[in-house]
From Swiss-Prot:
Lineage, opening ranks: Bacteria, Pseudomonadati, Pseudomonadota, Gammaproteobacteria, Legionellales
GO BP, sorted A to Z: cellular response to hydrogen peroxide; hydrogen peroxide catabolic process
Name of the protein this chain belongs to: Catalase-peroxidase 2
Function description: Bifunctional enzyme with both catalase and broad-spectrum peroxidase activity. Important for stationary phase survival.
Name of encoding gene: katG2
Record-marked site positions (Transition state stabilizer): R104
Positions bearing the Tryptophyl-tyrosyl-methioninium (Tyr-Met) (with W-107) cross-link: Y229-M255
Length: 749
């Protein structure tokens, strides 16, 4: 959905500028400065502290899945349908139907998703909070959400804002004659804004996010600060359809859409509704977060005419694409190819396109006055579908095969609004389609009897007697499970995709060593499964995790502690056919501080990448700290490098890493031979004792991390260290087990 225009740049920038609020600007100057302000290079640990569970007014015991499953979803849908055509005086509906507005709202809630870090998307309902609620591209969506409030108020905790924002758009399409393929609930609400890197710019609608080759910096997906996708007038406001196609392909690709899905979404989405640019953006007031308190969360107050209805200003663009703005049709593609398009300007001053044929000037009905008619419009980004050779071929095929287009749009729309939800096991409700789609990273169902406690004990014995080392078993289990991303719920140990392309060949996973470990574990798996007469099996996915657990139990025993690492079977093994290789490539770790692995292509430092990895794993500061300390003494670094292995007993689970890191008997210096490496010398003898990376030393250098490291380095912390390491380990191993809750370790010392 392309709803933004360059002529409004100045207006939107002015709208949020403190200069128009003198007292506010003065208050900003007097604000206390943060530590990050004084020491901008200090490691930012805030990603590991958000969101705060105490912010949730529903309480820790609230179970949204139970509430949603008790919801009368059909009743909600009927209420939404009624709302669509019940126009309100305070914000009149175009053509008497709010459907197109709700589609835009849903699209912009979900369309922030990006593949490189899994952030964005509809989960959490973040469109309610800053900055999304005040992005220029989300102008007037505050009205759409306010229209939904009576329905949210009626059904309360049984449906989240996050689900309602998406459901409304889905119902809108159905009510206007388009057949979707379904809807899944399960998006829980966030209760506070979170800090996400949306780009480096300091002003709205700027674009300073390209590398030297003109490509977007990772992990960003949108091309402009404050837009969902691209500038609809063309790159930097230049009306060049082919240049626009390049930007569309890049940004939609980074939002998990291929060329066919991109064409389907644009052509399908623009079958509905219109753009709004009755006048210049100078008439618009501040966005919601900068508006006066009396506006009660509304923004973009419009002083032009009535400020609503026919006088609405949103993007600065003006007009509808089709002759049926509130009914599903294929008229968008028909108009796109049947007319020659000439450049013009909207009343708001935005560049757009109209048919060269003057006979088309009365094709489109007016949104409010039945006596008026208009020409259809296209945006520069629409014409990209006509002139880009790849897009054009797809669009013409859709034009000639309407049923194929309908199916493609239905599937692309479903993907758009569900892409950030993770596997189908998280889907709720009666409208979930039965088909498993490859972008959902499917895994087979458990159609066999699971192993019991005796089997687990026997299997652990076989693993430990197989010749595999503690290091190899721990590294393999970690490599399998730590692909999980709590942002879009992708990755994790379930599926055992570590044995498949592309994961089996990732440098971070030590491919040759990994192949050896997997071969041994597969032999144990086959021998066990073939020996069972009652249909009992163990998956390789389970066996990989069990191997890591067994190795940790053995390592703890060497430290004097008998432990049982909690293990719950139930993972299954995906096939290569269930795995979209390209889709999984974005999960490859370019840095993993837990394994002391770092690819120099990163644009962040190793400690920053460690925090990023821990954040994706949903770890806290103590969990990140204890895991690094444990992984080091277990000798679990990639490539068997010895950086940070501060122990003379590698393979024994103890707190040596912290004890030796904090010891004043060591003096640290930068290596003169290897960039990024530090050398620890004995102060008394000058003898080289340790080597480390910045990831290792940050736990002694950063004051907050040092405080946690000290907690694990005390004489009475040995058992606590092991307990906490096991609990954090199990959290990672079970991160993708949405069917269970992680259990805590039980130590018998």
């Amino acid at each position: 959905m392309f709803k933004r225009t360059i002529p409004l740049f100045a207006a939107f920038t002015l709208a949020i500028s403190p200069s128009i609020f003198p007292n506010y600007a003065h208050a900003q100057e007097d604000k206390p400065k943060t530590n990050q302000y004084w020491w901008p290079k200090m490691l930012d640990l805030s990603p590991l502290r958000q969101p705060n569970a105490t912010s949730n007014p529903m309480g820790e015991k609230f179970n949204y899945a139970e509430e949603f499953n008790s919801l009368d979803l059909n009743a909600v849908i009927e209420d939404l349908k009624k709302l669509m055509t019940t126009s309100q005086d305070w914000w009149p509906a175009d053509y008497g139907n709010y459907g197109p507005l709700f589609i835009r709202m849903s699209w912009h809630a979900a369309g922030t998703y990006r593949i490189y870090d899994g952030r964005g998307g509809a989960n959490g309902g973040f469109q309610r909070f800053a900055p999304q609620n005040s992005w220029p591209d989300n102008a007037n969506l505050d009205k759409a959400r306010r229209l939904l409030w009576p329905i949210k108020q009626k059904y309360g905790r049984k449906i989240s804002w996050a689900d309602l924002l998406v459901l409304a758009g889905n119902v809108a399409m159905e009510s206007m004659g388009f057949k979707t393929i379904g809807f899944a609930g399960g998006r829980e609400d966030a209760w506070e804004a979170i800090n996400i890197n949306w780009g480096p710019e300091g002003k709205w609608l700027e674009s300073k996010r390209q590398d030297k080759d003109g490509k977007l910096e990772k992990p960003l997906a949108a091309t402009v600060m404050g837009l969902i996708y691209v500038n609809p007038e063309g790159p930097n406001g230049v009306p060049d359809p082919l240049a626009a196609a390049e930007k569309i392909r890049e940004t939609f690709g980074r939002m998990a859409m291929n060329d066919e899905e991109t064409v389907a979404l644009i052509a399908g989405g623009h079958a509905f509704g219109k753009t709004h640019g009755a006048a210049s953006g100078k008439y618009l007031g501040p966005a919601p977060e900068a508006a006066g308190i009396e506006e009660q969360g509304f923004g973009w107050k419009n002083s032009y005419g009535s400020g609503k209805g026919k006088d609405t200003i949103t993007s600065g663009l003006e007009g509808a694409w089709t002759v049926t703005p509130t009914h599903w049709s294929h008229n968008y593609l028909q108009n796109l190819f049947n007319f020659n398009w000439v450049k013009t300007k909207s009343p708001g001053g935005a560049i757009q396109w109209v048919p060269e044929n003057s006979n088309a000037s009365s094709m489109v009905p007016d949104a409010f006055d039945p006596s008026k008619r208009h020409a259809p419009v296209m945006l520069t980004t629409d014409l990209a579908l006509k002139f880009d050779p790849v897009y054009s071929k797809i669009a013409k095929r859709f034009l000639d095969n309407p049923k194929e287009f309908d199916d493609a749009f239905a599937r692309a729309w479903f993907k758009l609004i569900h892409r950030d939800m993770g596997p189908r096991s998280r889907y709720l409700g009666s409208l979930v389609p039965k088909e498993a789609m490859i972008w959902q990273d499917p895994v087979p169902p458990v159609d066999y009897k699971l192993v019991d406690a005796n089997d687990i004990a026997n299997l652990k014995g076989k693993i430990l007697n197989s010749g595999l080392t503690t290091s190899e078993l721990v590294k393999t289990a970690w490599a399998s499970a730590s692909t999980f991303r709590g942002t879009d719920m992708r990755g994790g140990a379930n599926g055992a995709r570590i044995r498949l392309a592309p994961q089996k060949d990732w440098p971070a996973n030590d491919p040759q060593e990994l192949a050896k470990v997997l071969k041994t574990l597969e032999s144990i798996q086959n021998n066990f499964n073939n020996a069972q007469a009652d249909g009992k099996k163990i998956s390789l996915a389970d066996l990989i995790v069990l191997g890591g657990n067994a190795a940790i139990e053995q390592a703890a025993k060497q430290a004097g502690y008998d432990i049982i690492v909690p293990f719950t079977p139930g993972r299954t093994d995906a096939t290569q056919g269930m795995t979209d290789v390209k889709s999984f490539e974005v999960l490859e770790p370019k840095a993993d501080g837990f394994r002391n692995y770092f690819d120099k292509s990163n644009n962040m430092s190793p400690p920053e990448m460690l925090v990023e990895k821990a954040s994706l794993l949903k770890l806290s500061v103590p969990e990140m700290t204890v895991l690094v300390g444990g992984m080091r003494v277990l000798n679990a670094n990639t490539g068997q490098n010895q950086y940070g292995v501060f122990t003379d007993k590698p393979g024994t689970l103890n707190n040596d890493f912290f004890i030796n890191l904090l010891s004043m008997s060591t003096e640290w210096k930068k290596s003169s031979e290897t960039e990024g490496i530090y050398e620890g010398y004995e102060r008394k003898t000058g003898k080289l004792k340790w080597k480390a990376t910045s990831v290792d030393l940050i736990f002694g250098a950063n004051s907050e991390l040092r405080a946690v490291a000290e907690a694990y380095a005390t004489d009475d912390a040995k058992e606590k260290f092991i307990q906490d390491f096991i609990n954090a380990w199990v959290k990672v191993m079970t991160a993708d087990r949405f069917d269970i809750k992680a259990a805590n370790a039980n130590i018998n010392s």
